[in-house]
Amino acid sequence: MEIYKEVGKPAEVVKRFQIAKMKGTHGIGHTRMATESAVTTLGAHPFSTGEDQCLVHNGSLSNHNSLRRELIRKEMTFETENDSEVAASFITYRMNSGRTLKEALESALVELDGFYTFVVGTENGFGVLRDPIACKPAVLAETPDYVAFGSEYRALTSLPKIEKAKVWEPEPATVYFWGH
């Protein structure tokens, strides 16, 4: 898994890292509107806190400080004050404890307070989870060739054959996973 993080407009970042030339089974990108931490490369998404795992997050966690302290006691480390890094570390800790990505995301529903949509990538695919009240917008598009996720439909409109895609809003408190 390769992680590319940068501050800037999406088109500039795509060009700088030559994203269009990359090959692989899946990719996760994120355009961030910072609400709780500085706009820096370190604070940019995705957050990777475990081997072959990364997370992007739209939302805000109200219990991230207490969860951070709990995870530090369990020997997890942090580089930022970002609540998204706490969410990524939470998922990593659960997966390192033997849980699957699905099980780790299901435990997030119980232990994380706030409103959120997570997209988590692993070497085997990616998962999506929305909080129990589906506070943050989310839309998925599926075709035989790809699965795409965005906060808004307009983020997906330039995808190939989007007009033939099954486009839908993921349910609250439901884990979705696509593998390869």
Which stretches of residues belong to each language-model region?
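Conserved short alpha-helical segments that host acidic/polar catalytic motifs at enzyme active sites
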Residues: 1-180
